[in-house]
UniProtKB/Swiss-Prot annotation:
Lineage: Bacteria, Pseudomonadati, Pseudomonadota, Gammaproteobacteria, Pasteurellales
The protein's name in its UniProt record: 3-hydroxyacyl-[acyl-carrier-protein] dehydratase FabZ
Broad class of enzyme this protein falls into: lyase
SUPFAM superfamilies for the chain: Thioesterase/thiol ester dehydrase-isomerase
Organism: Haemophilus ducreyi (strain 35000HP / ATCC 700724)
Recorded GO CC terms: cytoplasm; membrane
Keywords carried by this UniProt record: Cytoplasm, Lipid A biosynthesis, Lipid biosynthesis, Lipid metabolism, Lyase
Gene: fabZ
GO MF terms, alphabetically ordered: (3R)-hydroxyacyl-[acyl-carrier-protein] dehydratase activity
Biological-process GO terms, alphabetical: fatty acid biosynthetic process; lipid A biosynthetic process
Protein family: Belongs to the thioester dehydratase family. FabZ subfamily.
Length: 154
């Protein structure tokens, strides 16, 4: 995996109940199940458990279900939202965190029911309220997806 941490530090975990206080998303669109570690303003690692009960599998594809790439990208974007809130604090009532742009998206392998996506996002820079991140998603230690993400908090 890309993000390396010191072996002697205790991981910072955020459970789904706290994630629901950080993000406005709800079923079926909350795509971050747990944060397994993060460092404010730098990086975050989270998981998304993919089950056969995901609503997308009724049509993508019923006889051979594959988790849609766009939902992997959305999961990475939601992970950046958790990192932003963990870094800068909870959003105001009238504020939203938007997925603004994506570049260089690459899908390396299919993600299927039973897989656990390990999402890794790293802060790159912020310019005029737009924050740029790089994101990667792994299954069993193998890269499934990578992309550059831009998000805005307004």
């Amino acid at each position: 995996m890309a993000i390396e941490t010191a072996e002697n530090r205790t991981p910072k975990v955020i459970e789904v109940t706290e994630i629901m206080n950080m993000l406005p998303h709800r079923y079926p669109f909350l795509l971050v199940d747990r944060v397994t570690d993060y460092e404010e303003g730098k990086w975050l690692r989270a998981i998304k458990n993919v089950t056969v009960n995901e609503p997308c599998f009724t049509g993508h594809f019923p006889s051979s279900p594959v988790f849609p790439g766009v939902l992997i990208l959305e999961a990475m974007a939601q992970a950046t939202g958790v990192l932003a809130v963990a870094t800068y604090g909870k959003m105001r009532e009238d504020e939203l965190y938007y997925f603004a742009a994506i570049d260089n998206a690459r899908f390396k392998r299919p993600v299927v029911p039973g897989d656990q996506l390990v999402l890794e996002v790293e802060f790159l820079k912020e310019i005029r309220g737009i924050t740029k991140f790089t994101g990667k998603a792994y299954v069993n230690g193998k890269l499934a997806c990578e992309a550059d993400l831009m998000c805005a908090r307004k």
